Amino acid sequence: MSTQEAVGVGAGDLGRDSWDAVVVGAGTAGCYAAATIADAGYDVVIIERKSPEEAGHIACGDALKGADTFPDAIPKSQLEPAFTNTGVDHGRFEIPQEDTVLEIPVPGELAVVDRWTYGRKVIEGAADAGATFHYDTVVQDVRQTDDGTVTGVDAIRKGTPRTYDAEIVVDGAGALSILQDKADLADSTFDTNVTYSQFCSAYREIVHVDEPVEWSDALVFKPTERAAGYLWYFPRTETEINAGLGFQMTEEPMHLVDDLKRDLRNRAEFQGARVEDKLGAAIPTRRPYDSAVHPGFVAVGDAAGHVNPTTGGGIAGAAYAGTYAAEQAIEAMEQGTVDEDVLWRYNERVMDHFGARYAALDVYNILSTAVDIDELMGLLAAMPGEQIAEALYSGSANLGWGLKIKALLKARGHYGTVWNLYKTKQRADELLSHYEDYPSSPAGFDTWQAERDRLMESVYETTGADPKY
């Protein structure tokens, strides 16, 4: 089957310059956005910088929380061939400093995926819905009217300049997107408070071993030698492991390849292991964008900070963000206007679904840049981690008195850190409550943002961390 047949591109489409919608990036968010728009009968093209053979090959930890549900535009059944390990059901947190391992239950459905296979399946799903793909196409600039409305992009394909005009542009180009560098977004609510230091630098290898690992039912985490970083070992199968590590870019740079190699060499289960694939990436371990809309323009997935800032997980959030953005884009096209007011509902749905929770979790990412890693690991090893994890996953802000007393008894010697964590959780809860009152229109945005910034000052004061934003 040819590439054009595989993605439904007719020869005439390669020279076409006018579309209802242009989506930049064939990742999870971009493909779900395009599939949703195409399902509604609109002409949509996905511009992808990679070749047809490389598209979908993305650096990822491969772990997926929330594997039980995906938006209808690309159903879970189409993605399931990429789910290589659905037997994972808990986290395993290794603390070498304390010679301790915490087995932490994780509610909900987990899976580890083959990310390249998953990427191809998502692309197939968007193509099946009617989206057109233009591969080997790199965006160079964003087209805007005098009033700032985005009307398309300029790109280059194999040395040939291309113009794409559209009613709506969806930015699914990933972390530190070039579209946001090129577009003038100053006169809208679109979040431009974005710097590299809010991101995590990560690297992963796909490693094969001869004997099954003992922890094939777990997602394994291990702290790096400095704060604000961790190693992971996520089993695709009993003998195929996604091994990687990352660190927050506020910290002194790590030698990612060498540090991972050192840890692999010190683990008996990886003796004689063979490396199949290597990739690195920047991950937006930050709060979601305050607003990801601008007239004629919406950002989705990594391009809008739709990632859990404590784990780096972003597949499920990207799928829903792409869907929500597309549904709002469809409404805007039906109304004949792509103003911020019409697109705003997309922001609300993101915050309601996962954005508020991610913003609160970002408080703990901020704390990790200021806390002494050995002190924190000592506390975690002393605390009844399994029970505390279960209580926190349940969504309860209050632990039972029995658990509180047990925790305090086991945390002797770490009371300063316990108090810091307690106060930090109060700040996170306050922030969560504020995000749950996200404004229903741009009119209330400035007031909401000012109060959020005030709450963040309290976060920095409590944690002792340098300002992240």
List PLM regions with ranges.
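Predominantly flavin-linked oxidoreductase catalytic cores and closely associated redox partners
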Residues: 26, 127-268
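Short beta-strand to alpha-helix junction loop
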Residues: 105-124, 248-256
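Beta1/beta-strand and adjacent pyrophosphate-binding region of the FAD-binding site
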Residues: 10-29, 45
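Active-site-proximal substrate-binding core of FAD-dependent oxidoreductases
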Residues: 324-377
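FAD/FMN-dependent oxidoreductases across multiple families
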Residues: 101, 141, 253-326, 333-334, ...
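Glycine-rich FAD pyrophosphate-binding loop
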Residues: 22-26, 35-58
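Core beta-strand elements of the Rossmann-like FAD/NAD(P) dinucleotide-binding domain
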Residues: 15-19, 158-168, 293-296
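N-terminal FAD cofactor-binding segment of flavoenzymes
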Residues: 42, 50-96
